[in-house]
Each structure stands twice: as structure tokens, then as C-alpha cells.
Amino acid sequence: MRLAAYCDAELFAGAERVLAEDVGMIGAVYVAHAPGKRDEVLGQLAKRRLALATQPSTRFIMYWETDANDVDFHIRDARGGHAWYSSKQLRSGGELYADITTGYGPECFAIRGKPTAAPYRLSINYYSQGPMGYGMGLLQIQKFDGQGNLSFEDRPYVIMTDQAFVDLGTYR
């Protein structure tokens, strides 16, 4: 399934990878709660060239409300690592998938397995203010245990000043 079949894919440049992982986790949650449907779920995933999520992960997914702004996600770990658009990986583990400069995102930083360098400090930078004058959106933290349990934490934000940083707290 290609996103371009449903919308202007350039406006959601980071979405296909994030959505593919979402589907794998949703499938795992479904199988955990309806084990008799496992073969059906696996078959539907295979038809779409998707995979059932089986490993723990923590994802930080940033969305925003207008396509004319450039909002960047920054994550710092307890070991002094800093991931952002110019340095997309932390030595402690984790990867920023893409730097989305046009469209609505999402920008996603994912840690495979269990996080090993907590606490993580989360912030955003209003890199380029668009004609709207403000950046508004959401950082969603998704924790998947690899066994079919998924939890969410939402951290909304509004950023008003070009080049400003907004602290979105820590994650343990």
C-alpha cells in the first residue's frame, strides 16, 4: 500500500514508514487479544508486505498542523548523545527516520528494544517559521512491549518564535 494512492505523499513525507510500523503493532495487539485470528492477521499483513511487530520499541513521533513550517525534533540521552536532523542516531540506540522540511511530517525517533540511556530530554526547534506565524502540534510517545501491549503519551505544543526551542520534558 502506497500513501501516494490516497493523498499528496509529499505533504506526509515521513508517514509511510511510521504507518507501516503502526500496522505491525496494531496487528500484534489484535493477535494478543484474539490468538485464534493470528493466521488471518499474518495473511492480511503479508498481502500488504507488512510485518507483525514482535520486538519492544519506543517511538517519539512529532506531528504539526501546517505544511509551511519547519519544526525539528531533538532528543538527548543521559550519556550526552544528541540526535537531530544533522545527526540522526544516538550511540546508545535509536534513529531519527527523516528530517521533514515541508508538509505535516511526521518526524519519528525510534528506539528498538528497551531504552538504555534514560532519561531522554525531548525538545523541538522552530527552525523556519511559515506564513501561519506559529507552529502547533503534538509529540506522541508510543511504547510497545513486543507482546501486544501498546501505550501512548501525548505532549501537545505551540511554538510562536522563529528559531525558538520548546522543552517537551523528559522520558524515562
For each feature predicted by the language model, list its residue ranges.
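Alpha-helical protein-protein interaction scaffolds
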Residues: 1-35
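Intrinsic-disorder/low-complexity signal
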Residues: 36-172
